[in-house]
Every structure is written in C-alpha cells, then in structure tokens.
Amino acid sequence: MDTSRKTLLGMAAMTPLAGTLLASKTRTTPAVDASAAARERIRERYFPDVILRNQDNKKFRFYEDILKDRVVTINFFFAKCEEICPLITSNLVKVQRLLGDRVGREIFMNSFTLKPEQDTPAALKAFAKMHGAGPGWNFFTGKPSDLELLRRSLGFTNPDARLDQDVNQHIGNIRYGNERLMLWAACPGQANAKYIAESIGWVIRND
C-alpha cells in the first residue's frame, strides 16, 4: 500500500493478515484458520453489532448487515450541519457518480448521524434527497449510545477531548475498506473525488 492510502486510525491491526484470505476456500489450512481468527478479533474489537435504521426506516445490524463480506465507505455527519457535512456529502455524491452502478453491487456507502435525537429516518431521507444521494448509499440513525459506541470504535475521535465533545468539530474523514480481506484505509472527506473513487477501487482490486 502506498503512503497516500493510510491505514485506518486505530485499526492498523487489520491490514497485515489481509492477504491470507486469498487462500483456497475449498479446504482448511493454517493460514485460513489464522485469518478467520484475526477477522473475528477485529470484529469483536472494532465492529459492535448495534441495531440501526436507515432513511427508509429499515432495521440493520452494523456488522451482520452493513459490513460483513462487503466493500464499504463510512462517514459521520448530521443533517443540520452547516459547515463540513454539506461539503463532504456533495463530494461523496461525486464519488458515487464516478463509481457508477458498482455502488449497491460491489460497493456500499454508509453515513452515520452524530445527532440521532434529531435525525429521524424521515430527516435522513430528506437529507439524502436534497443532496442527490443515489441507490446503494444508506444514511443511518439509532440509539445515541449506540452511535457514540460506533464512532469511538471506528476511530472517528479527536485526540483533544474538548474538541471531541463538540459535535460541530467532528472528524471529516472517510473510512473505506474490504471487510472480508481486512483491508482498511482512510482519507479526508474533501479530498479529490476521483482520488477517493480510485482509492475505494483499490480495495476491490485486492479482492
């Protein structure tokens, strides 16, 4: 991996064993067993299987329904954000258009609210429509404690505790990865849309 594709903060342990999952699926080998064990440890540590609802009010479990065996993007936002969120969302719309029909088929885009008390499924649906988000991109809400657990588990935190408590100062990164291969990376949400799309394609090409 080149230096421009930095390993997901706090989740670097995912990367070293990624290649072992390319081993044959037809028989059990020590390498496959080790990879399966590593994947399970990562799931237990970083991917709490909390229950969420999307903009269509459909129920999802974070790991089983959103991450497992998929190539995904992850970011955090809130609908009434007037600063960084609209810019990142608009940029992700460009990314989705560049990826075309692979979104919803090979790649799944996921945005999680930082203000679940305000962002109901209906509010998320209106936000998605306003920004032109297409199929294959889900916007999630849920219990405040579950969203906070998710934010911290995924490393969307600021090392400055004071800033971390201010939702208006939230991290504007995008995480992307291939859960099955344990390949994870991150980039700024306002990075060039073509660069983001190509970076996401990188974790697919390694599948």
Predicted regions, residues:
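Short, internal strand/loop/helix patches
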Residues: 126-171
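A short beta-strand-turn-helix
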Residues: 51-71
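N-proximal helix/coil linker or "cap" segments that precede and/or mark the start of modular domains
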Residues: 22-49
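Thiol-/selenol-based redox modules, centered on thioredoxin-like
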Residues: 163-207
